[in-house]
């Protein structure tokens, strides 16, 4: 992660995609919640989390219950002070970021075992010259309990220079910067920091032409192809909100400009070794490849291909086709989903489970496509459910309890997912 933009919740109303604007291309923001507006702020965090990851500063006198509610609402992590860190000791370190101004290296080493990451506050000049180099070695020497690297953040209350930020990037310090400091149009706003320059601030390449290897994936994480990027192409991609790359022969390559297979940019990030960019995009048209396939490794398959086919059938299915009938007859579709779900439950062999699950997914995804719901929407929702730190008992509804009793089964057991 090259930077963490700070986004003021008072600027947010209802549409995360629109109101976050180009900030969503970073894939993650930080914000702050206050007790006097907690209910409203909680809903805003929930809404923004449907689109991008949010780290929430809870140090404005929020209690443990409010902190847990924010995590349940989908916050990727929360910033806490040392006192709250101790009260939330049962929460995974992956979800906790300690906010501090301590320079005690021994204390930092101890606290970093409880908080996955640490964010320092105040002016960088207030810290000893070699402090962040030493702190970085401690923070980064171990991975998180649930996987992933620990992060060292530094909050900048005033806009720093690129030279200052580069000096911190050497030690893998991630700057927390107000969104008002940033721009995707540096030529028009020369006093602000270029978002493209910040994303690439620690990226490296061993190519003589200085281009960065770039993996392009769709919203489901499926690799579409390998391309190259330059500072200019990244800047243009952020400015236009589309996939723009660097052709080694033709210069800037605006994907889809001639074919119509335009890519809508979701976000850009850099891999753990900082030598490969990843563009996450929504691919339109027939696909990414010049051979009119979704990706450069052949045809799409599995759920991705099923969704693509169903979307096409919804828009172009000939009258009388079975899929067209399903889209136009909600009672039939409902019956088929219930029928296949029951057959899946009754399946007794591995082969039967595979068969019935495939049937159920066909009808279930047809239902989703008919309602304008994508696999990516579902995937994101599953991620948010996984982030909950408190769980409901999960009993079946009464009607299904009775149905199971009729089959001689046991209706309810307590579990935690």
UniProtKB/Swiss-Prot annotation:
Residues 225-299 are annotated as: Phosphoribosyl-AMP cyclohydrolase. One of its GO terms (cellular component) is nucleus. The keyword ATP-binding applies. Residues 303-387 are annotated as: Phosphoribosyl-ATP pyrophosphohydrolase. It is an enzyme of class 3 (hydrolase). Its EC number is 3.5.4.19, 3.6.1.31. One of its GO terms (molecular function) is ATP binding. It is found in: Cytoplasm. Gene3D superfamilies: MazG-like, Phosphoribosyl-AMP cyclohydrolase. It catalyses: 1-(5-phospho-beta-D-ribosyl)-5'-AMP + H2O = 1-(5-phospho-beta-D-ribosyl)-5-[(5-phospho-beta-D-ribosylamino)methylideneamino]imidazole-4-carboxamide; 1-(5-phospho-beta-D-ribosyl)-ATP + H2O = 1-(5-phospho-beta-D-ribosyl)-5'-AMP + diphosphate + H(+). Pathway: Amino-acid biosynthesis; L-histidine biosynthesis; L-histidine from 5-phospho-alpha-D-ribose 1-diphosphate: step 2/9; Amino-acid biosynthesis; L-histidine biosynthesis; L-histidine from 5-phospho-alpha-D-ribose 1-diphosphate: step 3/9. Keywords: Amino-acid biosynthesis, ATP-binding, Cytoplasm, Histidine biosynthesis, Hydrolase, Multifunctional enzyme, Nucleotide-binding. GO terms for biological process: L-histidine biosynthetic process. InterPro entries: HisE (IPR008179), PRib-ATP_PPHydrolase-like (IPR021130), PRib_AMP_CycHydrolase_dom (IPR002496), PRib_AMP_CycHydrolase_sf (IPR038019). PANTHER family: HISTIDINE BIOSYNTHESIS BIFUNCTIONAL PROTEIN (PTHR42945), HISTIDINE BIOSYNTHESIS BIFUNCTIONAL PROTEIN HIS7 (PTHR42945:SF1). This is Histidine biosynthesis bifunctional protein his7. It comes from Schizosaccharomyces pombe (strain 972 / ATCC 24843) (Fission yeast). The gene is his7.
């Amino acid at each position: 992660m090259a930077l963490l933009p700070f986004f003021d919740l008072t600027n947010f109303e209802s549409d995360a995609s629109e109101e976050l604007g180009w900030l969503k291309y970073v894939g993650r923001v930080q914000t702050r919640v206050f007790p006097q507006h907690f209910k409203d702020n909680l809903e805003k965090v929930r809404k923004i989390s449907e689109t991008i990851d949010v780290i929430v500063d809870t140090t404005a006198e929020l209690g443990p219950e409010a902190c847990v509610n924010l995590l349940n609402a989908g916050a990727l992590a929360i910033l806490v002070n040392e006192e709250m860190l101790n009260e939330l000791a049962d929460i995974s370190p992956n979800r906790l970021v300690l906010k501090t101004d301590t320079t005690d290296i021994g204390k930092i080493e101890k606290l970093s075992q409880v908080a996955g990451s640490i964010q320092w506050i105040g002016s960088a000049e207030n810290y000893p010259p070699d402090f962040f180099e030493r702190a970085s070695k401690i923070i980064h020497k171990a991975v998180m309990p649930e996987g992933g690297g620990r992060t060292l953040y530094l909050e900048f209350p005033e806009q720093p220079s690129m030279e200052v930020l580069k000096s911190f990037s050497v030690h893998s310090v991630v700057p927390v910067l107000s969104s008002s400091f940033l721009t995707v149009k540096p030529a028009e706003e020369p006093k602000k920091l270029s978002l493209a320059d910040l994303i690439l601030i620690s990226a490296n390449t061993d190519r003589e032409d200085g281009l960065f290897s770039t993996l392009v994936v769709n919203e489901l994480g499926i690799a579409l192809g390998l391309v190259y990027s330059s500072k200019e192409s990244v800047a243009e991609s952020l400015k236009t909100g589309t996939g723009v790359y660097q052709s080694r022969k033709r210069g800037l390559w605006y994907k889809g400009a001639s074919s119509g297979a335009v890519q809508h940019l979701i976000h850009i990030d850099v891999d753990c070794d900082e030598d490969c960019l990843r563009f996450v995009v929504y691919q339109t048209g027939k696909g990414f490849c010049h051979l009119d396939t979704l990706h450069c490794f052949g045809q799409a398959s599995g759920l991705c291909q099923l969704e693509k086919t169903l979307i096409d059938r919804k828009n172009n299915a000939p009258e009388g086709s079975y899929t067209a009938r399903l889209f136009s007859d909600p009672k039939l579709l409902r019956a088929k989903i219930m029928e296949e779900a029951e057959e899946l439950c009754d399946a007794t062999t591995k082969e039967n489970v595979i068969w019935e699950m495939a049937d159920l997914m066909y009808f279930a995804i047809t239902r989703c496509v008919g309602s304008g719901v994508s696999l990516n929407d579902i995937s994101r929702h599953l991620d948010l459910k996984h982030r909950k730190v408190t769980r409901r008992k999960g009993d079946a509804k009464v009607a299904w309890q009775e149905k199971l009793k009729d089959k001689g089964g046991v209706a309810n057991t307590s579990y935690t997912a």
